[in-house]
Design a protein with these regions (language model features):
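A charge-rich, low-complexity, intrinsically flexible signal that marks solvent-exposed coils, linkers
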Residues: 1-118
């Protein structure tokens, strides 16, 4: 099964709030990634999910480190695996089953992310 991770990213120069969360979904030799304002909560309202450039798979491992290019600090706070297939089109809807620290049906559609009961 493919892996996922949620990183707490602080000090990013393009983030006026000072803290956001990067959702990483393993895909081949990299991770498809979205920026979230909060940690997804089961059955909570969907939140904005901003697509980001692919991240390196090293962020799936337990770690905290400075982000290259003086772009802040990131720490992995949740991780696990997922069932399902990421669509080829990066702008297509995503529906996956998460197992691990976060559990449930992850859905990313129309720029919004939600986590619900399976």
């Amino acid at each position: 099964m493919a892996r996922y991770a949620l990183l707490r990213h602080t000090g990013a120069p393009d983030d006026p709030s000072g803290c956001h969360f990067d959702l990483l979904l393993e895909e081949g030799d990299h991770c498809r990634t979205w920026r979230l304002a909060t940690v997804p909560q089961l059955n909570a309202a969907a939140q904005p999910a901003v697509p980001l450039p692919a991240h390196r798979k090293i962020w799936l491992d337990p770690r905290s480190a400075a982000v290259s290019g003086n772009r802040g600090w990131a720490e992995r706070i949740h991780a696990g695996s997922y069932c399902g297939v990421l669509p080829n089109a990066t702008d297509a809807d995503v529906t996956l089953q998460l197992e691990g620290d976060l559990q449930g049906c992850l859905r990313i559609a129309s720029g919004r992310c939600s986590l619900s009961n399976p």
